[in-house]
Amino acid sequence: HSSTLVTAGIYLLIRFNNLLIETMFIKFLLLISGLTMFMAGISANYEFDLKKIIALSTLSQLGLMMSILSMGYYELAYFHLLTHAMFKALLFMCAGKVIHLMNDNQDIRLMGGMSLYIPLTSLCFNISNLALCGIPFLAGFYSKDLILEVVSMSNLNFMVFYLYYISTGLTMFYTIRLMMYLMVNDYNLLVIYNLFEEDYIMLNSMFILLFMSLISGSFLSWMIFSYPYMIYLPFNMKMMVIYVSLIGLLMGGLISNMKIYSLNKFMLTYNLSF
């Protein structure tokens, strides 16, 4: 999944960046990748399938990498590729474990209260989710914030600017919604739950990835860039990422508290099972 979707596609374009940058196709790529980022963020907010939400968040980050690549900043795309690999791998491992413990069920409306039953997995899940949002000093912050500041410095039009920032807000939106459904709301699947935290073989790998999700951003930013980027922005532009993230957080919290269920009536068939 990751090899085909993210690594092969982005890495090939990074390698062929000098050829691509000369063509007219690059502006078209910027538009398409910006719209991909935006649409993936919107779609993830309407999904109730855990794996689909994480897959759409991967697609959103793919759009982010493609768009910064199409602006000519291939080293930033590579940096984000590496940091994103750390926390997204952790996120997929946590999701796989949760789905397995939920009796192979993927619907987030049936999950809830995970932080009480599987605390270590919940810890890994939440930290990787926050790294995805670009919370300061986690892995995602160093690459994502730098990309957004470089975009703010560039001389592109407002459409690209809005696409970037709205997509960042949407990332926070669906992440908080997911965390509310999984960690805060009530457990809804069975009368007796079979959640347990004893899979230490998997937890070892998860803790290594957790450690990398915490330190890989600053570590790689020292290793990859030979000199720091000169970014000169007014205070409000600098704080723009924080503003959209806070709006996304507020919206995610409000929406997940409302009893909004999709028009899909397939969920009613679960009543026949028990």
Model regions and ranges:
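Core, highly hydrophobic multi-pass alpha-helical transmembrane subunits of bioenergetic inner membranes
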Residues: 1-274
